[in-house]
Amino acid sequence: VIVKWDERRGVAKFISGQLTEPSDKSKTDLSIDFIRQHKVLFGVENPDKELALDNTNAAPRGRFVNFRQKKDGLDVIGGKITVRIENGMITTVANYFEPNIAVKTTPTISLEEATAIARREIISPKQTDTASLVVFHWEGKCYLSYRIDFRFNPGPEPSRYRVYINAHDGTIVLIENRVMHEGSATGSGIGVDGVLKSFDTYEKGGA
């Protein structure tokens, strides 16, 4: 068995080998039972509350079972655990779970206020497609955020913005233009030093 450790999170980030004996359990039950048995290794205090089944999909060998992370019922963006099962056995676990999230999950500002802030920032007349309250991990810190997706704007510079607004103080955590240009899309966000910075992002199909 190979175990790779994440020093920052203090958890196993990847495990591979024959991790279980062959089982007739469903892939979902086999996976969540394994996580329950080894929850300390993955940094999960309560798997039944902190994980939700996202989907299962085919792997080159076997099948992946994907769980997304939850915090007080909210999705934790990027937080997940993926289990690979071959012939009734778990063979790999990839752990992106973010432990010890210290963020209050009751917002201070409303969705309407957050949407108005986002609209002013990107100067967009377009309506929003979707908006949701999430926990967003960005540059080593977790934020309670409104994730606001704006509809496609064809020009003069095509855009489909996704904006994360801090749900406690109304500051902008991250702005992404999710339209795929040649190469990369652009985004900007507040760094750990409090400075707004730009970066390249990639998103398949511009979705």
Predicted feature locations:
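Zymogen propeptides/activation segments of proteases
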Residues: V1-A207
